[in-house]
Amino acid sequence: ARRHLLIGGAASLVGGGVLAQETPGLALNGEWRQGGFAFGRTWPRALVFVDGEALTAASDAGLFVVGFDRDAPGSAQIEARGPNGQTARRTLDIAPGRFPSTVVNGLPSSTVEPTDPELLARIRREVLAKTEAFTSRVAGDDFRDGFDWPLATYRVTSQWGSQRVLNGTPARPHYGVDLAAPQGSIIRAPADGRIAMAQTGMHFEGGLTLIDHGQGLITAYLHQSRIDVTAGQRVSRGQAIGRVGMTGRATGPHLCWRMKWRDRNLNPALMVGRRAPETVYNQP
């Protein structure tokens, strides 16, 4: 198992790229790589800036999360500005990711290059619904204790960030981790949160559920055969939310597990077993 340490005024690398840093007023840990993230702790309700842009605010406990997408540059400056004018900042080195190619054949042509006008109109409606759901911004820090895998048993069949070729046609990168499992396997919430979307019959995703874990950190569960939650519902870590299926664009029963922080696609597997820093900063 990988461990992380928090060392004052320094960075620590302890196995597999797990990093931690602490400077007065700001503690960080996480996976600082493309597709990775940083958990942070600072002053309660401090504004958090990434490369000079205000993107989130710390919770009442001073906790926050930021993400680094597949194309993130080689560094990121994290700055916290407390309610009383105090500031703290760190610059993180973001490691490059390694993204293999994945070839998928045997998909219905309508799910790869749809041309039917009615279908295209339906896809546009579904994109709008998903976009709205991904704007969910629940206050709080349900991510603070990290994440579990959503399935008890599974086999990883496609890595996050891989460049896909579908029926011989190059497609956008795959922003999910595919977990093959028997049809009907129980999908469980990997962390506490609120359901931002629960919809069956999506053209590409089939049965789709989104969970908001706070501050714009949202996980997605695709291709479900059954959904057991409703939009707006609070869920707890380990609670059953649905069943594995092969609905939408899928060639076999599996769960496509995704994660977004605001508009950035993250690798959910990197967050499994991570916890936010425990250092507490009180207001001066």
Protein language model annotation of sequence segments:
Residues 2-21:
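N-terminal export signals
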Residues 21-97:
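Ser/Thr-rich low-complexity repeats and stalk/linker segments
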Residues 53, 69-71, 83, 95-97, ...:
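Solvent-exposed coil/turn segments that connect beta secondary-structure elements
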Residues 91-205:
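Surface-exposed, glycine-biased beta-strand/turn segments
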Residues 186-197, 228-244:
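Short, well-structured beta-strand-loop connectors
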Residues 235-253, 257-284:
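Extended, charge-rich intrinsically disordered regulatory tails
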